[in-house]
């Protein structure tokens, strides 16, 4: 189920917009919407979304450095690897597909590879390469989630893993234990206790986060989980599973207070990570890197009530079909590089994300780092990976 569509329905009930705005910066490179072969046979253009300044998002610089290292390693080859940072990668893909072509290589967004590109045979099938090189463990969840009738058209180097984070100091002050995450009733009771403290603290950041409540509640049943992992349909909206999840989320949000609702969690993120005024934040494992040093000992990871996690291979690296043999070979080598243990360890320790490679020992890396936030990242990843219910969002 598309979380933005769920959010739209929540808007109607709660009177708050929950659709995050999206950027409008276009590609800085000329010819960004030309066919992949127009750049010349000796250049492999790679569009990615890590355009942010290091001061804005340090992880973006880490990813660019990883890309640049690959380019330097292959600088003497017949094909030049050219990473291009853009904010409008999905627009570039859509424009090229509409014209019957596909970028040489692109890290597609959460929407994945457009079906129109697949139906036109514009995208390279990565599965034979993965199988021939025994990369099943290296690509991890991609191998099953991105399987389309025996074909794999994208591999994401990170797993988008979501649970929640809670402030143990606030919980202790309100007399709450981790039993609060047993189910959504105990969760609601816990949020009421936080509200009853009578100070500036409140339960959780609602709005965008409320869509995750709906999805997590639905994922607690097999029928609901199947609906979440499919397109939103009229039958889904009219189902008992959706009605129960929607009503529960609406009730929780109303009790939590409309002033604590936002269309983008980022607008109130500092309330949790820096100011310590919020009991719970629905966010991915990557939130570990945003916790202020003064709160790092108090903030802990947990799963959604009912031992539910949301995890997705997301979009990922996709390669154009019918390129030259040399360009295709370099593109495949890049995918092997990005899913290698060495790079995946950097993605965990420096990007602070859940790596796709299942052979990476996250706990060992965290202990070696000696960094509390990294250790909590490892704990969050481990919880998601071992959840009773893992739903694809």
What residue spans do the PLM features occupy?
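Extracytoplasmic/periplasmic solute-binding protein
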Residues: 151-157, 162, 185-234, 278
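Hinge/lid segment of periplasmic solute-binding proteins
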Residues: 85, 109-161, 185-189, 300-302, ...
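Extracytoplasmic "Venus flytrap"/periplasmic binding protein-like
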Residues: 73-138, 173-174, 269-280, 356
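Glycine-centered hinge/linker elements that transmit conformational signals in sensory
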Residues: 189-193, 232-262
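Extracytoplasmic/periplasmic substrate-recognition and gating elements
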Residues: 72-73, 293-354
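A ligand-binding cleft/hinge motif common to bilobed small-molecule-binding domains
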Residues: 114-117, 285-297
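Conserved N-terminal structural module of periplasmic/extracytoplasmic solute-binding proteins
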Residues: 6-9, 20-115, 326, 330
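Long, aromatic- and glycine/proline-rich binding clefts that accommodate carbohydrate-like moieties
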Residues: 349-393
């Amino acid at each position: 189920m598309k979380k933005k569509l769920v959010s739209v329905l929540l808007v109607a009930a709660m009177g708050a917009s929950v659709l995050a705005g999206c950027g409008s910066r276009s590609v800085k490179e000329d010819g960004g919407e030309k066919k992949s072969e127009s750049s010349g046979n000796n250049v492999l253009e790679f569009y990615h979304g890590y355009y942010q300044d290091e001061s804005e998002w340090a992880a973006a610089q880490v990813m660019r450095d990883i890309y640049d290292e690959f380019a330097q390693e292959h600088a003497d080859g017949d094909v030049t690897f050219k990473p291009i940072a853009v904010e409008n990668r999905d627009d570039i893909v859509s424009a090229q597909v509409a014209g019957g072509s596909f970028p040489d290589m692109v890290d597609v967004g959460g929407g994945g590879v457009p079906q129109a590109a697949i139906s036109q045979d514009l995208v390279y099938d990565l599965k034979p390469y993965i199988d021939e090189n025994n990369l099943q463990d290296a690509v991890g969840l991609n191998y099953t989630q991105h399987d389309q009738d025996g074909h794999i058209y994208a591999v994401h180097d990170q797993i988008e893993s979501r649970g929640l984070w809670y402030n143990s100091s606030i919980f202790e002050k309100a007399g709450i234990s981790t039993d609060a995450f047993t189910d959504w009733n105990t969760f609601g009771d816990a949020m009421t206790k936080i509200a009853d403290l009578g100070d500036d603290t409140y339960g959780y950041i609602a709005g965008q986060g409320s869509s995750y409540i709906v999805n997590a509640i639905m994922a607690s049943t097999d029928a609901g989980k199947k609906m979440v992992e499919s397109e939103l349909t009229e039958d889904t909206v009219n189902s008992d599973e959706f009605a129960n999840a929607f009503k529960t989320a609406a009730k929780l949000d109303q009790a939590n207070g409309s002033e604590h609702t936002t269309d983008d969690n980022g607008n109130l993120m500092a309330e949790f990570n820096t100011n310590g005024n919020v009991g719970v934040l629905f966010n991915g494992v990557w939130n570990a890197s945003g916790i202020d040093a003064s709160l790092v000992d108090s903030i802990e990871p947990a799963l959604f009530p009912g031992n539910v996690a949301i995890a997705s291979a997301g979009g990922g690296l996709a390669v154009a079909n019918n390129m030259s043999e040399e360009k295709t070979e370099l593109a495949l080598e890049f995918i092997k590089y990005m899913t290698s243990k060495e790079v995946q360890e950097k993605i965990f320790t420096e990007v602070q994300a859940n790596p796709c490679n299942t052979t990476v020992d996250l706990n060992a890396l965290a202990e070696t780092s000696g960094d509390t936030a990294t250790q909590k990242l490892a704990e969050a990843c481990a919880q998601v990976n071992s959840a009773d219910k893992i739903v694809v969002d």
